[in-house]
Amino acid sequence: MPYVYANAKALQDTEKVGNHHQCVELIQHYIRVGQASTWQQGAAVFGNKNIEVGTVIATFVNGRYPNHNSGNHAAFFLGQDTGGIWVMDQWKDDIAKPRVSKRYIRKLHNGSVRSDGTYIRMSNNAEAYFIVE
């Protein structure tokens, strides 16, 4: 069952939240999703026409959220087109993104999956996102 925060669009230009301004802290601040280590990989996001605005999405490796300091990401889904997905997120160290804001994540054109099943540039690869369950 997906987690959905109905007011995700209203977060545009709000202050970052959490002690470290991590992406997961944004999700946990607005909706009860538990610890990221308990998250389960659901359906793929890119190309899925049945995702509700505000659905929690994240990058996964072998069905689990990696929970590393960098290289993985979580966000609220806002929409998509043929080139990528729109999300509402926060980035801890991005000075160009000082507040919670909308971001477009493109589908990579040079192949997106490695031979071990991990995704190239996961945080910036539309095909690497899945619904959190």
Swiss-Prot record:
InterPro entries in the record: Dae2/Tae2-like (IPR047746)
Catalytic residues identified in the record: C23, H73
GO molecular-function terms, A-Z: hydrolase activity; toxin activity
Broad class of enzyme this protein falls into: hydrolase
Domain of life per record: Bacteria
Keyword Membrane: no
Main location: host cell
Pathway: Cell wall degradation; peptidoglycan degradation
Swiss-Prot/TrEMBL GO biological process terms: cell wall macromolecule catabolic process; cell wall organization
Subcellular location, record wording: Host periplasm; Secreted
Effect of C23A: No longer degrades peptidoglycan
GO cellular component, one term: extracellular region
Keywords carried by this UniProt record: Cell wall biogenesis/degradation, Host periplasm, Hydrolase, Secreted, Toxin
EC annotation from Swiss-Prot or TrEMBL: 3.4.-.-
Protein purpose: Toxic component of a contact-dependent interbacterial competition system (also called effector-immunity systems). Secreted by the SPI-6 type VI secretion system, probably into the periplasm of bacterial target cells. A cell wall amidase with specificity toward the D-meso-DAP-D-alanine bond (D-meso-diaminopimelic-D-alanine) found in peptidoglycan of Gram-negative bacteria. Toxicity is counteracted by a cognate immunity protein Tai2 (t2585), but not immunity proteins associated with a similar endopeptidase in other bacteria.
Family: Belongs to the cell wall amidase Dae2/Tae2-like family.
NCBIfam families: BPSL0067_fam (NF033857)
Protein name per the record: Type VI secretion amidase effector 2 protein
Source organism: Salmonella typhi
Originating gene: tae2
